[in-house]
């Protein structure tokens, strides 16, 4: 027992580490002063409290300071005695921030020589300590508040202090093995896409296609500008109609009134309407179909027989060019031999008429359309509704002029040579300067043939917009399915009866369309239900139908009535 007592110092003479664990300090066998064995094994600095030095060097008042020594020391070892003969610690050697204390071990742990043996050092956890952490001798994990503070030696905060913001610093990317890819792959195509490195920003993995975002913003800007252009042109068309007296529905025009009306119709800017429709389609096609549209194939559901690729929009007349009820189309036979139709209207594939009472329901194979978000869908519908208003006003003006008898002769000032006409619209690109009087005339009735050509061009552009939007059949106007049901085409009806019928239909159009749009559930496969949403489109058109015609509204029913009236007037004037 005596030998064991000689190996250990008393509790009052123990170092800070041993005293904090309430253990006797084992002294070195060679000397009685200096570091103890526990601190030597732990490779830690063996420190002693300055109270021990005061006891040794004090001759007066030793009893008073002895009472202070008998008080239990606090955790952290700030008031522990030092070994006799040890040099007094100074402020530079042991600053208050670097006074170390060990983690408390439970009592009865003397089976190990030291709680800070090989298992308690950082050499086991980190065989090769990184430069970001201090040495193991400077670490004091027992003091929790000091360890978690930003100014302690446990956490090296120098990378954070070098930059202005707390987390705006550059990670060490020299060893990326510790940062695997998000899908545990090493594909070089999934490498980190870093932005500008002027401010030493953190390179982040970008999964968003920035080009697609810019394209979407560009499309939104174009649609917004196009909506403004639609509203401006609608106001101009209405002003153009009222400034020239519009269409007189009470009797036939004679004398100067008839010539003025013909001049007004000849200067009607249909080229601007075609250009607006073309811009609307050109903006929508890359947005709705970013991967392109495959050539659809029309399939007959009764025989499952593929009839080949459908003729592109603008090169077919199976839907809207059928102006007669007998199924015969107005083809090349109505054109005069001296004035052939344009090349892009002369090569049409005539569709076979469908049986009475049945609607053509072709299915098409095309690429999947992109789904629009609600703001973009509302912007598209806004442009489309404005375009519907322009078309409705245009067909109303044409219908008003075609209701009157054809003039005996046509003015020579509206005629153009064949080369001029071929150059103006044979290229297939709409010309905004194209006027109604520049269309190919006929010797007998130039207004009728020009109106027929204008209707063909306008309905082609309208049908292309409907196909791009993928509207259901009940929301279309340029196809057979969108024609009004029960339209009267009797040749014996006079102008007054037709006018009364159109007026009554216009009055009841809002209620009838609102009911039909609310109850209809017919949606084409891959149509508006996927691109925009049939319910959203019906809600917009239902609101449009509730607006009065004096406000430029009326909805799809008014446009259908105007289209049917123009077709009926053309059949009567051209004896079809």
From Swiss-Prot:
Its main location: nucleus. Gene3D superfamilies: Zn(2)-C6 fungal-type DNA-binding domain. The gene is mpsE. Residues 15-46 bind DNA. Residues 95-109 have a biased composition (Low complexity). Keywords: DNA-binding, Metal-binding, Nucleus, Transcription, Transcription regulation, Zinc. InterPro entries: Zn2-C6_fun-type_DNA-bd_sf, Zn2Cys6_DnaBD. Residues 47-61 have a biased composition (Polar residues). It is found in: Nucleus. One of its GO terms (cellular component) is nucleus. One of its GO terms (molecular function) is DNA-binding transcription factor activity, RNA polymerase II-specific. This is Zn(2)-C6 fungal-type transcription factor mpsE. Residues 47-123, 334-369, 404-424 are annotated as: Disordered. Transcription factor; part of the gene cluster that mediates the biosynthesis of macrophasetins, 3-decalinoyltetramic acids (DTAs) which feature a tetramate (pyrrolidine-2,4-dione) unit connected to a decalin fragment and that have potent bioactivities.
